């Protein structure tokens, strides 16, 4: 079905242009992800390659951190900045609240504020991570470890992060899907061949013949687990709670009844991306401190281990962030107050529920229940593979396998729905003033 949709999409000029534009942007991103930042000895970086923090950072950067490339920061600073701006709109800063109510003009101001915060965070994060890696490695990761080198690397990585952020915005406007998610999607896909190779090397090379059957059992179990996660995730991400609504007789041209679709997981996969990005922030701060106080400070090491997602405390912290962001982003995606207001303006209502404040409270309660289901689902899918790796000593690629699959599936679902939307537009192009070109 997907390939049929894709084939039909390529027949439409506008859709074809959007697909090719997205592919071009992703090609440029992957090209930049292989250009190592000047002044960095990437071979020595392998000493810290197994750090859980680096794995998480590599995930949210779109697989650009492992080479310490110009795009090593990826969209992580932008994601953190977006969270900050959305929080500031919740009656914290009056100016941001005012902008949030100004429509398109306000949205542009908020986007500009997000860019400025991204710039500051990217600079702080790039210098902090570089200094931290230098402190943790017995070899020089920075070829000339002085403040000029740190500043130069910081400026280069910050510039790269801003370029990647711009790429994401271009995908939003001229391509397919959410730019941030698509960039992370491309990074995950690019890492699949190396992940397969690492499993093959670990399970089938240099092992005793008697261990081969267990290796096959592991691989089959891994494939079956992935299939189950894909099926369950696809089902949950597309499941809806249909709230019946009715129209007053005074509303001309409207049906007598309809329904309001609310997704079982209203927040989608964004909370997982947010949580992954936020978990890198404490590590950045701790690496600043580690650089200034020395690498053998006991309390710093203890705190770093506690916040690492591979430890039980770190797992709980990661799961808690996913739950909190699921509730937060569900109410960002579905605003009960605006929904109640729009229903009232349309002359529609939910049976047995009073219009206005009554509808707002009803939708809020329903959204809380749906967000509870969504948060538990996202948390379990993300945490179970990490716990399995801890308990059974599985290969490290398993740990973030659930998180990676969640992102891959959600981005694929969004892309298919967007394609179907454009094809539906083409189907009814004859009724429009400017039909889509198909040549």
Curated annotation (Swiss-Prot):
One Pfam family, short name: SecY
Q: Which InterPro entries match?
A: SecY, SecY/SEC61-alpha, SecY_CS, SecY_dom_sf
The answer to whether UniProt assigns keyword Membrane to this entry is yes
Coiled-coil regions listed? none
User: What is any one of the record's Gene Ontology cellular component terms?
Assistant: plasma membrane
The UniProt entry, under PROSITE patterns, shows: SECY_1, SECY_2
Q: Which keywords describe this protein according to UniProt?
A: Cell membrane, Membrane, Protein transport, Translocation, Transmembrane, Transmembrane helix, Transport
Does the record carry Protein transport as a key word?
yes
Compartmental location: Cell membrane
* Segments traversing the membrane: 19-39, 68-88, 116-136, 151-171, 176-196, 216-236, 269-289, 312-332, 373-393, 396-416
The membrane-topology field of this record reads: Multi-pass membrane protein
Functional note: The central subunit of the protein translocation channel SecYEG. Consists of two halves formed by TMs 1-5 and 6-10. These two domains form a lateral gate at the front which open onto the bilayer between TMs 2 and 7, and are clamped together by SecE at the back. The channel is closed by both a pore ring composed of hydrophobic SecY resides and a short helix (helix 2A) on the extracellular side of the membrane which forms a plug. The plug probably moves laterally to allow the channel to open. The ring and the pore may move independently.
Q: Which PANTHER family match?
A: SECY/SEC61-ALPHA FAMILY MEMBER
Self-association and partners: Component of the Sec protein translocase complex. Heterotrimer consisting of SecY, SecE and SecG subunits. The heterotrimers can form oligomers, although 1 heterotrimer is thought to be able to translocate proteins. Interacts with the ribosome. Interacts with SecDF, and other proteins may be involved. Interacts with SecA.
By sequence similarity, the record places it as follows: Belongs to the SecY/SEC61-alpha family.
Q: What name does UniProt use for this protein?
A: Protein translocase subunit SecY
Gene name linked to the record: secY
